[in-house]
Amino acid sequence: MENLPKSNSHNNHISASKGFGSQSPKKAKLTNRQQSPNVAQLFAQAVNYHQQQQFDRALTTYRQILAIDPKYIDALTNLGSLLKRLGQVEEAIAIYRQGLALKPESAETWFNLGNALQEIGQLEAAESAFKQTLQLKPNLGVAHFKLAKVLQEQEKLIQAVDCYRQAIDLMPDSAQAYTNLGNVLKALGQLDAAVTSHRQALQLQPNSAQTYYNLGNALTAQEQYESAAAAYQQTLQLKPDWAEAQLNLAVALIALENFEEAEQVLKQAVVLKSDLTLAHFHLAKLLQKQGDTSTAEVHLRQCWQLQPDEPKIWEALLLALQTQGKYSEAIALLQNHLKRHPDRAIAHYYLGTLYNNLGRYLEAISHLQQALELDPNLAIAHNNLGYALIQNGQLSAGIDSCLRAIEIQPNLAMAYLNQGLALNNQGRVPEAIACFQETLRIDPDYHPGNSNLLYALNYSPDYSPATVADAHRQWGQQVTSLTQKVLPQKSLSKLDSQSKILRVGYISPDFRQHSVNYFFEPILRHHDPTQVETFCYANVPNPDAVTDRLRGLCHNWRDVYNMDDDQLADLVRFDDIDILVDLAGHTGSNRLLMFMRQPAPIQVTYLGYPNTTGLANINYRLTDTWADPPGLTDEYYTEELIRLPRCFLCYQPSPTAPAVMDLPAKSMGRITFGSFNNLPKITPEVIALWSKILQSVPNSRIILKIRWFDDEPTRDRYLSLFAECGIDSRRVKLIGLIPDPNHHLAFYGNIDIALDPFPYHGTTTTCEALWMGVPVITLAGQTHVSRVAVSLLSTVGLPELIASTPQEYVAKAVALASDLPTLGQVRANLRQKVAASPLCDAVSHTQAMEAIYRQLWQKSV
């Protein structure tokens, strides 16, 4: 409670004699019955002891008087006041009640009783006592003030306002009454009136730090941050060591984006008061904004030690730990929290989400399910459970979880995104596209939604190349308008353009066990250090053995998963990169938005994505003349196409790949076709054409292998699609995940002829099939995505396997299936043929890339 206001005639305790109350005891006076000389003498002595602060003697003497005359009202009054002063409040209350039993019309005693009751928190009883006081003395301003304060403490704010205003009417010079009124008005949201009241208090008490502080709080609530900051600064001039005022000043400065001064103020606040949790919290947030996450963590840990169960604190600490890649510590933090609060749904949600990020999907599923048992309406937990189920191969269950999330929170963009991912993995491309479009209706700038939509368009035969290209361009224009930070152009010199060792950066989320590395690792391994100094920017959350191997091949390795786009762009510029190469395009976890900052003078896209990025400031795209014949596809790219002299790909087969097996048709007595491609490539149109092949080759069968066939509804759908084309389910074998890479390759031993899907060709699957002795029939299209196999087959010397029409595609497959001797000969020689081809000539391929890099550099300077 604030200091009590003073009036001309009233102090904390009301007394009929001047000076009595909280300051001095009441002196003896005659009552309507004459006091005995002994009692009067004792009372005078007690008052003297009281005034001399000889409290023990005063207590003894007052009690001696009351033993003689229990109805001695002045002795009761003074004894009650003394007991209260000594902290014996309950005894004081009992004494006041004795006095009121003798003299119920005593406003003074009712007032003192109210004070005592308020002190021990008996607010309703205190309210009643102050109301009794005012019935007896309606114009007693201090009683109105005290009643208002008790009402305020009970959050009876509207009544408190009326009482403070009555107190002000009776005590117009009471600064504290104006201050308290201002605080109540602020709590009621009457901010203009609150500010006015605090300013009136300052007119009466211009050197009150507390009043400036309260004014600052009201101005902050009004979002008048400049005025609030000025008020807090006045507070600190009067009281420099007030840590809370420094905290509130910093909050105002942060709102004004004066981050540097706010940081200094917060540092002073935590020095003055090391247990001021909010100061540590805001300081941590500022440090995180500057990228100093490690120091931010120190302050967040201080917060956590002070308030370990405050959700905002452990959530912020959790984020800081994750940002630094301290996943084990983040897990330990959550596990520790759950030991104390096993029924806290949000903690299970965070732990499940963390396990999701680490790829530990079974553990993620367990904790997310526990979160939903505790809080069935936690939409984001349903969404993240859906993601975990999808990644665990349970596509249909994952879709159900996403739908439940949408039912609870219809505008949850991520739920539509994850539903779209699952539908895409099931091969339900039109439905997936619709989900991605709904994601973007909710959040048009959501980057994963945009990239997944653009990626999905490549699978669908329903969109023309021009339509797909326009969608990419429109996205590029959209993000260009949103990009706020573009780094200044690096100055280039012609003097050393020929001899300079080029600093080439590669950025990818796939520097791990991923098919991209069958094509990237041989380049990294064979770069000439006299020509190129390599930098790898690994946007990888969960490094593995492949990550470690690539790190060992690279001159400079950067882990950038926890960097935002600005931080990553600054790092690329700091590394003085000459040529920055994107290896992901619009595939998952790409960093295309970082390229908008133009961190390198030459920016290139290559390898990971079969179409344009749509970004005008990615200058070039590396390809070849088979995948992108000059004049055929150039108009679909925002980048300038740079064609390598041979295949744009260089394949590194697994050194532990099993040997090529005999032609299975010899032992099986029938031809087996197959495809190990992702399901969105295997559209109903593809199945219809494959079914014609099966119908044309009696007793033949087809094997499709992809991890998503572990989901029973997905298997059933594909069997139904074949059945609709007249193919009995006994002729279709669907295989799910084979986790061991060598066992996966060995499974090609069950296939005689591989069928390439269209319009989206296989890449890794085509190379694997060829390496394992399995010829691949492909249908050439008019875009890069439908010409990758054209490049691969031409490079290894098998152009006869390339069809230009669906009819020719069927005819080539049927003809090859009908010629077992030729098929057997192809199988026997195919691995050697591939190994001797330019497809596996890593040295020449890398030299060609380095020559292109040099040409691009010379052109730029």
Task: Annotate the PLM regions.
Residues 584, 756-760, 780:
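Short Ser/Thr-rich beta->loop micro-motif in glycosyltransferases that lines
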Residues 531-533, 691-724:
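A conserved nucleotide-sugar
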Residues 523-526, 684-698:
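Short hydrophobic signal-anchor/transmembrane segments that target glycosyltransferases
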Residues 674-685:
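Substrate-binding clefts and catalytic carboxylate motifs of secreted carbohydrate-active enzymes
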Residues 1-670, 720, 724-729, 733-734, ...:
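Alpha-helical solenoid repeat scaffolds of the TPR/TPR-like class and their adjacent stem/linker regions
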Residues 507, 676-677, 705, 735:
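Short hydrophobic "strand-cap" motifs at the C-terminus of beta-strands
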